[in-house]
Amino acid sequence: MKNLCIIPARGGSKRIPRKNIIDFLGKPLIAYSIENALNSGIFDEIVLSSDDEEIIEVALKYGAKAPFVRDKNLSDDYASSTAAVQNAIEILQSQNQIYDHVCCLYATAPLLNKNILKQAYEKFIQNQSKFLFAATEFEYPIQRAFYLNENNQVYMFDEKHYKSRSQDLTKAYHDAGAFYFGTSKAWLEEDFIFKPHSSVFVLPRNLVCDIDTMQDLEFAKILYKVNHESAF
């Protein structure tokens, strides 16, 4: 079996400029994903998909390969990671580089480690699902969620659950925004991962942080330090 890791990292991040290579406790953010992929020992190649020369330069420095530059039409605010992965697989196939399994690993997942990737890969192989992705449990019952209308009035999505005990409600999970394993065939044929053909690798909440704002970035640093107390 040949395994490929694709790290999508476009250059046009808006809320955190240069997010993928911003300093994170002394190293570019993307370096953590590259090093975890390399140290996991499960990938034959770690390939960057980027439209940005500086990101490519940083990724090469930390051990990834960049055999192509991502097209600009796959690099705007509306471009999906799935489209970027499909594009990368197709380019590599045109170069006679064929892989059985492909992992999309986000550049913004510094809280992971090599063992998590290894365990997730093993579960993916055992489950024989089309995809396996990282997820985590919502910290509050989503059945009790509410929204505000245009007049700032409160409406519950479903009032019948208001008095239910938390332990009686079905647990809900969300995408951790970290990694997605899939067969090459599934990546090329499917445009939506979140279906019964997928399985999940559940991460504890202290290993999950969606880094979209500077506040998120600082919180991720705190989590990293807590998770690696002996190193600080």
UniProtKB/Swiss-Prot annotation:
Molecular function per GO: metal ion binding; N-acylneuraminate cytidylyltransferase activity
Q: Which residues form the signal peptide?
A: none
Per UniProt, the keywords (alphabetical) are: Magnesium, Metal-binding, Nucleotidyltransferase, Transferase
Entry protein name: Pseudaminic acid cytidylyltransferase
Alphabetized PANTHER family for the sequence: HAD SUPERFAMILY MEMBERS CMAS AND KDSC (PTHR21485), N-ACYLNEURAMINATE CYTIDYLYLTRANSFERASE-RELATED (PTHR21485:SF6)
Catalysed reaction equations from the record: pseudaminate + CTP = CMP-pseudaminate + diphosphate
Q: What family is this?
A: Belongs to the CMP-NeuNAc synthase family.
Superkingdom, natural source: Bacteria
Enzyme kind, highest EC tier:
transferase
Does the keyword field hold Nucleotidyltransferase? yes
What function is annotated for this protein? Catalyzes the final step in the biosynthesis of pseudaminic acid, a sialic-acid-like sugar that is used to modify flagellin. Mediates the activation of pseudaminic acid with CMP by forming CMP-pseudaminic acid.
Names of the cofactor(s): Mg(2+)
InterPro entries from the entry?
CMP-NeuNAc_synthase (IPR050793), Cytidylyl_trans (IPR003329), Nucleotide-diphossugar_trans (IPR029044), PseF (IPR020039)
Q: What is the lineage of its organism?
A: Bacteria, Pseudomonadati, Campylobacterota, Epsilonproteobacteria, Campylobacterales
